[in-house]
């Protein structure tokens, strides 16, 4: 972007990466070909975005950053492709726990800020049933309304600042519901979701008002999804990574 490029120092080689087509043969970006998005270096295709071990546009940019960092070391393309396909992401960071009747169940419990949740939503192409809320730490939730309107079928809210988040959604006509527990919110989201959708825990808040930490919150979410699947006689096909 223009701001970061303005900080270039004279005499230093600069390699850029971004979510658009690269400006030079040495830069990394994303190109569209035959309705398929590819990670590229200049005009050289590195990998189709769909083959990344983790999903979301934000993770595609993370992959591009890693490619740019390894460029000076002449890492073979085949080795890069293997790693990009096999890396399944970090726990609680847009992690695909599994699927239930074609509905992806995604744990993004580490998303404790509006910015983090916005990245998760903007990076997804699936219809999203978002579960959010908790201790907002005094954040302004205004930015969440617009992106939820574009990305979410509904937003299910829990925790101390649920009403504050709801207030940011109302001007955009976003459907939302308030719940007393994460278990209830998870069950309701799974009831509404259909094959091809995703139920996403991305709270935009800290967990301390209801849970020991974000790890505990993630475990409650996973257990709730598994319990709902069992109660409805459906398999919870466990997977790692995110798609």
Segment roles from a protein language model:
Residues 69-78, 82-92, 96-243:
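ATP-dependent carboxylate-amine ligase
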Residues 1-103, 166, 233-236:
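Acidic, Mg2+-coordinating active-site environments of NTP-dependent enzymes
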């Amino acid at each position: 972007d223009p701001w970061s490029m303005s900080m270039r120092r004279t005499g230093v080689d600069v390699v850029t990466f971004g979510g658009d087509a690269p400006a030079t043969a040495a830069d990394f970006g994303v190109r569209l070909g035959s309705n398929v998005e590819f990670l590229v270096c200049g005009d050289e295709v590195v990998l189709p975005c769909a083959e990344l071990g983790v999903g979301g546009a934000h993770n595609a940019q993370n992959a591009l950053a890693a490619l740019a960092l390894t460029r000076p070391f002449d890492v073979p393309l085949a080795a890069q492709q293997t790693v990009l396909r096999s890396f399944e992401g970090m726990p609680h960071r847009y992690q695909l726990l599994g699927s239930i009747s074609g509905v992806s169940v995604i744990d993004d419990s580490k998303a404790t800020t509006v910015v983090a949740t916005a990245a998760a939503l903007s990076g997804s192409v699936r219809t999203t049933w978002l579960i959010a809320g908790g201790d907002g730490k005094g954040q302004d939730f205004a930015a969440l309304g617009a992106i939820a309107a574009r990305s979410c079928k509904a937003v299910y809210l829990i925790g101390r600042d649920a009403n504050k988040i709801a207030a940011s959604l109302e001007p955009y006509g976003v459907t939302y519901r308030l719940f007393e527990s994460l278990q209830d919110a998870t069950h309701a989201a799974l009831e509404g979701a259909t094959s091809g959708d995703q139920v996403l825990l991305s709270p935009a808040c800290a967990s301390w008002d209801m849970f020991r930490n974000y790890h505990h919150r993630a475990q409650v979410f996973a257990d709730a999804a598994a319990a709902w699947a069992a109660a409805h006689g459906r398999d919870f096909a466990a997977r790692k990574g995110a798609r």
